[in-house]
Amino acid sequence: MARIAGINIPDHKHAVIALTAIYGIGKTRSQAILAEVGIAEDVKISELNDEQIDILRDGVAKYTVEGDLRREVSMNIKRLMDLGCYRGLRHRRSLPLRGQRTKTNARTRKGPRKPIKK
């Protein structure tokens, strides 16, 4: 297994799909990276030599991925919560942020029902 950005990339998959195992890289960005470094999308990771994997590693390193991206997202959410703005309050209360109704739906975000204490 090739190791790129601290993640073991699956060998048996095509390069364009295998790169999506990295947090922050979807199919479109994967296609862009492969086009940039000059590797075909339909080649499997196991067929790449070490030199091509190093080139691919450099291509991925240009983007914010994995731990750095996760940290950035959590810091953005924490910043909203510290500001006390509407979105920050909704994050703090674990409610939907984008105007969805909460009277009957939003069970995923709110969690399981809490029984009413008498």
Swiss-Prot record:
Pfam families for this protein: Ribosomal_S13
Location of region: Disordered: 94-118
Molecular function via GO: rRNA binding; structural constituent of ribosome; tRNA binding
GO biological process: translation
Alphabetical keyword list: Ribonucleoprotein, Ribosomal protein, RNA-binding, rRNA-binding, tRNA-binding
GO cellular component: cytosol; small ribosomal subunit
InterPro entries in the record: Rbsml_uS13_C, Ribosomal_uS13, Ribosomal_uS13-like_H2TH, Ribosomal_uS13_bac-type, Ribosomal_uS13_CS
Keyword check for RNA-binding: yes
NCBIfam families the UniProt entry points to: uS13_bact (TIGR03631)
Assembly: Part of the 30S ribosomal subunit. Forms a loose heterodimer with protein S19. Forms two bridges to the 50S subunit in the 70S ribosome.
Physiological role: Located at the top of the head of the 30S subunit, it contacts several helices of the 16S rRNA. In the 70S ribosome it contacts the 23S rRNA (bridge B1a) and protein L5 of the 50S subunit (bridge B1b), connecting the 2 subunits; these bridges are implicated in subunit movement. Contacts the tRNAs in the A and P-sites.
Family: Belongs to the universal ribosomal protein uS13 family.
Protein name (database record): Small ribosomal subunit protein uS13
Organism field: Aliivibrio fischeri (strain ATCC 700601 / ES114) (Vibrio fischeri)
Taxonomic placement: Bacteria, Pseudomonadati, Pseudomonadota, Gammaproteobacteria, Vibrionales
Gene name, Swiss-Prot/TrEMBL: rpsM
